[in-house]
Amino acid sequence: MAASGEEDMSELSPAAAPNLDWYEKPEETHAPEVDLETVIPPAQEPSNPAEPFCPRDLVPVVFPGPVSQEDCCQFTCELLKHILYQRHQLPLPYEQLKHFYRKVPQAEDTARKKAWLATEARNRKCQQALAELESVLSHLRDFFARTLVPQVLILLGGNALSPKEFYELDLSRLAPFGVDQGLNTAACLRRLFRAIFLADPFSELQTPPLMGTIVMVQGHRDCGEDWFQPKLNYRVPSRGHKLTVTLSCGRPSVPAMASEDYIWFQAPVTLKGFHE
């Protein structure tokens, strides 16, 4: 999935590209997208009330080389879908929901179509939730095409300033472009979700009620984004259950980006959970 460095630099906004002279190109090539949501079933869990952030709630993932900006977007989208399922905001993994709730019988199959129409009203909530999630995923892809994204926040419950749970994806240590060929996307996803599985961050959490989910992304202030709404004074919450997933690509560390050039943007849609 990796695009050429020349193409990436022409599409992204003014953030400087990291120096990748240290990196030797891998021999791997990209594989088709894999669905990892079904690998880890939802946690069955006793309770852990909201509490200040504890440093142990950290999942570090190190890739053996740089990845593309498109891959960074895919990591974000897959993590969002995974969290919604693990935290019981979706009754099934995203891909299964798309299959079961979007499969309309053929017109000639009258009996099946009547049965489907009888349950269609009950499916509207699911269809609306899927449409909103697909909209967020689509606009995330557009956003990642515009700018480097150092951080992503997935906020569950409460509001953007004081969520009940929040999940941080730290992409600031990655060198996301400047190479002709990146790592195998499917292998990177397996590495990411294996690290999450081993950390087992959901097992001690109580099954939550249905909650709203807010997506925040950090990007260059001059990226020209018009769907995600800029939040100039936003600060990452300091309370609530927090899990941080940090992605890096080994040595050397990526040069720090000027913090004043990057601001938070909030999705204008709050994703609503639903049960069957």
UniProtKB/Swiss-Prot annotation:
Interacts with MAD2L1. Gene3D superfamilies: 3.30.900.20. Disulfide bonds: none annotated. May function to silence the spindle checkpoint and allow mitosis to proceed through anaphase by binding MAD2L1 after it has become dissociated from the MAD2L1-CDC20 complex. This is MAD2L1-binding protein. InterPro entries: MAD1/Cdc20-bound-Mad2-bd, MAD2L1BP_domain_sf. One of its GO terms (biological process) is deactivation of mitotic spindle assembly checkpoint. It comes from Mus musculus. Belongs to the MAD2L1BP family.
